[in-house]
């Protein structure tokens, strides 16, 4: 098939990159599959997940990934005594109003994609294939193979230059050939994984749902929209009688790719790199693409382990297209593969603090918008959410509790080995140990009466009961000893805790002191208040500071309403119902403003609760 960006000639190059970097794994995702050549090539080595937002592409991938070799159609041959290709080619068809191709893509509709004779055969065969499948004469794998063979055969008699953006105004010799359905060419393998799956989704949506070892990304490089280039094949595959428009008969309802849009492509990549849940990422791109290559590599570094990105080059030819705006103007096309290991770790904060979100962070992040310049963690706490978020410019940590703020400021700004050494010195000096009440109380007295430093409080918090941070009205720390100690787990968390954004801003104060108008519209403000309808350590005794009640809740909702009116984006973690209690304030506010409610899941061990995330934006257009 003549297909824009077909990677058949680059299969060895992809294999070489995998071998060079010793990329290991069992699952291979081909996320922009096109004609399925990459998945077909690797199906003997991996479980393959294939995806394309064009349905006809899914059909072709199914034909190749559900079959280890060309199907033998045993049931069909047993019934008809011949192959379905022989049977279909021998069939005679009579025009009728239901034959969509015949009535819309031929001179009958003043279009010259196909001759009337060939269109008649294509319609008849398409409907016969459907009927054979519905009657159980052919299996799903056989159905996909037959339909893919039909689509491939259509391209052999199409009166076009290779795509369906336009048709010739004269009949090219190939278009006058009599239509014959021929078996689709595919690679034979000893077997194919029963777990191979083919999707027909927007890739950026899909990566929020799947995971694996190796992801191969081959997005559109130019402004050419595939939905316009292959609309005839799409309609034959779907056979859904769509509404058409214009001289070329394109589908009215169709999805455009953001990767082919100059103003959106960079943000599509940002979102894809942020959300992809695969260990190894390979991206095919070129020096003639919408997003400049150096910008794409720099973007990949932000999401790569240790910021390491490899760029492998390969000379390649330019494919001819009717769009001149993205052609190389005589420059030799250089195809590259960008390779990096995705940083998939969620680094848990070294500070144990009530309400921390480390167990639901991945689910929260799936709901982020595609473009995030700044991430404001407005009620930062242990900084689990903000520190793990890759915003392109910076992350802002804001916390109203001065002692929590001072500890997190110390953790963020102190080298890991120094912080570990400082804690160990205090542990040794006071002979701290599990349930060591006397030693713990000595350190607590020293902190309350002599040296109220962040490092002393942090060490106390490690050994305290359930790591509760509690103070009396005199601001004296009064949590008792617990069954905890400074162990290798803590040291590992300190070592691994690194903020992802290029810059971190630390702010002490209430969320209400944040002037959201100082931030651009691609800033995301995240709020994680205490929950009215649950029991939490930070509501117990008010921690010696302001507590959280209905008045506080109403103030927060008012602030969020103002933020929304200013055109800013927010995420709000909360709980609507728990143990028979309902947060009516929150529920009415959400319904009144029409905000989105996303279920995050169960959190909490002692007091399990079903958490939600409220957002005032849509990640994907509706």
From Swiss-Prot:
It catalyses: a 2'-deoxyadenosine in DNA + S-adenosyl-L-methionine = an N(6)-methyl-2'-deoxyadenosine in DNA + S-adenosyl-L-homocysteine + H(+). GO terms for molecular function: S-adenosyl-L-methionine binding; sequence-specific DNA binding; site-specific DNA-methyltransferase (adenine-specific) activity. PROSITE patterns: N6_MTASE. Its EC number is 2.1.1.72. It is an enzyme of class 2 (transferase). SUPFAM superfamilies: S-adenosyl-L-methionine-dependent methyltransferases. One of its GO terms (biological process) is DNA restriction-modification system. The keyword Transferase applies. Keywords: DNA-binding, Methyltransferase, Plasmid, Repeat, Restriction system, S-adenosyl-L-methionine, Transferase. It holds the Pfam family MethyltransfD12. The keyword Nucleotide-binding does not apply. Belongs to the N(4)/N(6)-methyltransferase family. An alpha subtype methylase that modifies unknown specific adenine residues, and protects the DNA from cleavage by the LlaI endonuclease. This is Modification methylase LlaI. It comes from Lactococcus lactis subsp. lactis.
């Amino acid at each position: 098939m003549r297909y824009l960006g077909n990677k058949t000639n680059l299969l060895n190059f992809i294999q070489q990159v995998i071998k060079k970097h010793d990329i290991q794994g069992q699952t291979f995702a081909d996320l922009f599959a096109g004609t399925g050549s990459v998945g077909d090539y690797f199906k003997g080595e991996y479980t393959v997940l294939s995806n394309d937002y064009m349905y006809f592409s899914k059909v072709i991938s199914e034909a190749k990934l559900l079959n280890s070799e060309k199907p033998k159609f045993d049931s069909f041959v047993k019934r008809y005594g011949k192959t379905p290709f022989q049977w279909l080619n021998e069939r005679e068809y009579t025009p009728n109003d239901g034959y969509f191709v015949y009535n819309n893509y031929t001179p009958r509709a003043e279009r010259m994609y196909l001759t009337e004779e060939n269109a008649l055969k294509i319609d008849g065969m398409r409907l016969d294939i459907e009927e054979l499948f519905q009657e159980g004469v052919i299996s799903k794998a056989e159905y996909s193979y037959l339909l893919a063979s039909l689509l491939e055969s259509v391209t052999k008699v199409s009166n076009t230059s290779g795509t369906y953006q336009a048709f010739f105004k004269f009949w090219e010799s190939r278009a006058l050939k009599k239509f014959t359905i021929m078996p689709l060419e595919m690679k034979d393998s000893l077997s194919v994984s029963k777990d191979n799956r083919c999707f027909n989704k927007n890739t950026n949506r899909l990566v929020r749902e799947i995971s694996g070892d190796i992801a191969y990304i081959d997005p559109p490089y130019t402004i050419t929209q595939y939905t316009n280039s292959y609309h005839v094949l799409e309609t034959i595959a779907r056979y859904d009688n769509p509404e058409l428009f214009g001289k070329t008969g394109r589908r009215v309802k169709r999805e455009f790719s953001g990767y082919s849009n100059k103003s959106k492509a960079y943000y599509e990549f940002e979102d894809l790199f942020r959300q992809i849940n695969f260990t190894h990422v390979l991206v095919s791109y070129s020096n003639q693409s919408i997003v400049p290559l150096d910008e794409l590599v720099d973007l990949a570094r932000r999401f790569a382990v240790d910021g390491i990105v490899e760029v492998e080059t390969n000379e390649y030819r330019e494919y001819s297209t009717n769009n001149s705006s993205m052609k190389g103007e005589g420059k030799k096309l250089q195809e590259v593969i960008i390779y990096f290991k995705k940083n998939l770790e969620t680094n848990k904060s070294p500070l144990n603090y009530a309400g921390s979100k480390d167990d639901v962070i991945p689910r929260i992040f799936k709901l982020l918008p595609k473009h995030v310049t700044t991430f404001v963690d407005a009620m930062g706490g242990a900084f689990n959410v903000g520190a793990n978020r890759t915003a392109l410019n910076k992350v802002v940590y804001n916390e109203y509790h001065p002692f929590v703020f001072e500890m997190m400021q110390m953790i963020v700004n102190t080298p890991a080995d120094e912080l570990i050494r400082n804690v160990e010195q205090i542990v040794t000096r006071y002979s701290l140990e599990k349930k060591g009440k006397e030693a713990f109380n000595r350190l607590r007295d020293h902190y309350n009466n002599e040296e109220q430093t962040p490092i002393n409080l942090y060490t106390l918090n490690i050994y305290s009961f359930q790591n509760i941070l509690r103070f009396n009205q005199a601001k004296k720390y009064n949590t008792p000893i617990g069954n905890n100690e400074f162990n290798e787990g803590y040291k590992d968390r300190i070592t691994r805790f690194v903020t992802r954004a290029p810059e971190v801003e630390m702010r002490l104060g209430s969320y209400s002191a944040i002037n959201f108008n100082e931030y651009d519209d691609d800033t995301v403000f995240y709020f994680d208040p205490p929950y009215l309808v649950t029991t939490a350590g930070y509501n117990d005794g008010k921690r010696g500071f302001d507590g959280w009640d209905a008045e506080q809740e109403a103030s927060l909702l008012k602030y969020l309403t103002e933020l929304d009116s200013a055109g800013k984006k927010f995420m709000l973690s909360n709980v609507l119902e728990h143990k028979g209690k309902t947060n009516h304030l929150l529920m009415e506010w959400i319904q009144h403003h029409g905000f989105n409610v996303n279920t995050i899941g169960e959190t909490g061990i002692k007091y399990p609760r079903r958490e939600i995330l409220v957002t005032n934006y849509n990640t994907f257009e509706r």
